[in-house]
Amino acid sequence: RDGWICLEGPGGKEQQVHMNDDWYRLVQLALPQNGTYRIRYKGVGLIQMYLSGGPDLMERGIRFLDPDSGDEMELGKWYDTSVREQYHFNPFMNWVNDPNGLCWFKGYYHLFYQSNPFGQEWNDMYWGHAVSRDLLHWTHMPYVLEPQPGLWRDKEHKGGAFSGSAQVEGEQMHLYLTRHHGPQEDGEETREWQTEAVCRDGIHVEKERPCITERPEGASFDFRDPKVQRAEGRDYMVLGSSLDGVPSILLYVREGGRWLFKGPLLQEHEPGIRTF
């Protein structure tokens, strides 16, 4: 089927996005300020809709809109229910799991998290984002990482932006994460690799690139969740995996811009465990 979304702006200017056979997809449309807009759609369902950008976004946060009416949603009423966690962070709606990239950068604590914006179950993974000045009051930010584009229309495979960490270096935040692609049931066709991305303004992520694409000899297809730490002037990374059938934390060190495998840092010999 041919579903579409059309944004009509000042002067009747239109932006159209055709969805075709895409199953789930995050669509971004540019809105110049100080205009009136109308959104039309057919053959698709809008699950979440928000406004982002503009000045002071770190303080204001994004503005969630009702997909049917276009009205701004009042978060106080949305969160003030007996089934909502009131102390710890939770997203606006739908699935959340692993927290990632926890760091302090340019005056804010940053929390990234694995998310499925489209439903209340695990699916292809996005990275959501929130910021805080005190670790109690959180401001919602735009999603920063999406699944690989081919997964939008592929029901036979799963993947996306899996867990990772952050390292702040001066005016840049470096995000390290695992990209996953494989069949619905994990196995030897499953592929996981590590990437690095840069964030300069605390909002937008750019220049994501692979940094470790091949597993060391003997490592299983479970090869994920990079944690990067600097010690004595050198950058180290640990990854969860299994080495020759033994659950292992793999140690890497950065040398000359490349990550080199040094061996297992810790192993678990208790039977019945698949991976760290």
List where the protein language model places each region:
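Beta-rich carbohydrate-recognition and catalytic domains
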Residues: 1-225, 229-276
